[in-house]
Amino acid sequence: MAYVDYSSNYMSQIPFRTGFGYDVHRLSDGYDLWLGGVKIPYEQGLEGHSDADVLLHAVCDALLGAAALGDIGVHFPPSDMTYKGIDSKILLSRTCTLVREAGYEIGNIDATIAAEAPKINPHIPQMRRVMSEVMGIPEMDISLKATTTERLGFVGHREGMEAYATALIAVKGAF
């Protein structure tokens, strides 16, 4: 496996960049359900090394990917006990700092959560508020959607949840 040096000071000549993120976690008893930095009432939660906020993890990967800074596992590895049980809002905040330190501004986020239950839509306004505060961008620049998988696959069988996210960033001053 080739080693990729994400510490390069190289700045792309492309003023606008997009990134894509994906994350998945298993639903299990004994965990709280955190999505978009919001605790959602439900009988199960997502299992993971951190608080397993599948949405915020996908957003982190989208932002890091857009800036060519690797992925969430590179910066916050599950092998590091510092991140055991960590609030994913902290990871998102640190990710935004990394992106800004690399010379970029965050434009917008578009993300989708796939879950059979519970209903996610009632919680989206609060998720957008929380993410806006953590990321330092306007709520109107954060689009969140929820869908089911029509009872297909592990998500449809209520075994887990997944999230997809895209991010637009730009070289500072391009917006």
Predicted regions and their residues:
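RNase III-family endoribonuclease catalytic core
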Residues: 10-125, 135
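C-terminal edge-of-domain segments
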Residues: 155-174
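Mobile acidic interaction elements
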Residues: 151-153
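Pyridoxal 5′-phosphate
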Residues: 144-148
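N-terminal amphipathic/basic-hydrophobic helices that include classical n-h-c signal peptides
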Residues: 1-10
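Short, low-complexity, polybasic intrinsically disordered segments
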Residues: 124-128, 158
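Short acidic capping loops at alpha-helix termini that bridge into adjacent secondary structure
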Residues: 138-141
